[in-house]
Amino acid sequence: MIPYVLGIDSGGTKYLVRAAALDGTILGEFRGNTCSHYYLGKEKAARETLNNLGNCLARFGGRPQECLRIVCGSTGYDSPEDGALITNIYENLPGFDCPVYCVNDVELAHYIATGGVGVLALAGTGSIAFGRNKNGKEVRVGGWFKSIMGDEGSGRYIDAKALHHYSRWLDGCRPSSPLLKEIERVVGSPTRKALMDYSLHMASPPWPAANLGEMVDRAALEGDRYATQILHDAAACNFDLVQETIQLLHMEQEQNLCVGIWGSVLMNSAVQREEFKRLLLTHYPQTTISIPKKDAAQGAVDIALRWYREGGSCWKILRNRK
């Protein structure tokens, strides 16, 4: 018998589950496809979730009945109805009979980056800001679907901006540049039909991972002014989300304002990250910027272990309340 806990990062394009023994030793992990109920529907999301967990347990011969806690940070947890649906999936996994705590992935990241008080900017496949002040008030800004101009500053946003730039080149409005050559290689051929086919693929759920950001980064580092403009625009969008969160929480005058950075787009793009930092420190020079060294799945594992050892409420742990 190997008692263990599970920490899960259920994102929009990937699913990462990690198992740990009660002393914190990592027993196994598995990376699978998204289990978002928005993309798959509840029944398929439940099947894929069980499949992902089963693959993780197979790494170390774990059995469902030996699991003592599950903590999951999930995309698509955008309302009480979403929360009830996602929690229901985990509470009804065949063979598992342990306490479960599901939360929006940005709240999990917020705890990892700030310890429970401060503001988090998350820019990965999508984007959102989340904050909590010392009085316990919570605010989230952004995180809406792209069809209502949401996810500004995210990987999807950068993809759309890059393809828009490419479309203007096809129209004859833009000169050739390193970025356009990179995009042409991905699209396949410099034709309207190829661009329409590629954009249709990107717009059809389950949406593929945002994948043009690295090209935009490389082009910006080579001096492509349009690529730099796209990344600076994305940084400004993410700063706006954070600033609105700060203002809603009345944290403008906080002497020790902590702002965490999370997500592949902000973490991996030096050009966007540095512009975001510049904007943030220009407006709020008292800010301490936190860039966590652990990923969301490990953060979920750590919380699950603490929850098991201390008992009580996982909700309170995430908010640093006794």
Place the predicted regions along the sequence by residue:
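Glycine-rich beta-strand-to-loop/alpha-helix junction loops that act as flexible
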Residues: 71-77, 123-125, 257-267
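Glycine-rich phosphate-binding loop of actin/hexokinase-like ATP-binding domains
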Residues: 116-173
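Short beta-strand-loop/turn "lid" adjacent to the catalytic site in phosphate-handling enzymes
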Residues: 54-94, 101, 111-114, 258
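Acidic, glycine-rich active-site loops and adjacent beta-strand->loop/helix elements
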Residues: 74-78, 105-108, 126, 145
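ATP-binding/phosphotransfer module of carbohydrate and carboxylate kinases, centering on a glycine-rich
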Residues: 1-66, 113-118, 163-322
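A short glycine/serine-rich beta->alpha loop
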Residues: 37-38, 76, 143-152, 286-291
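Glycine/charged-rich beta-loop-alpha catalytic/anionic-binding loops adjacent to active sites
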Residues: 91-94, 137-146, 279-288
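Conserved phosphate-binding catalytic cores of ATP/NTP-utilizing and phosphoryl-transfer enzymes
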Residues: 1, 98-121
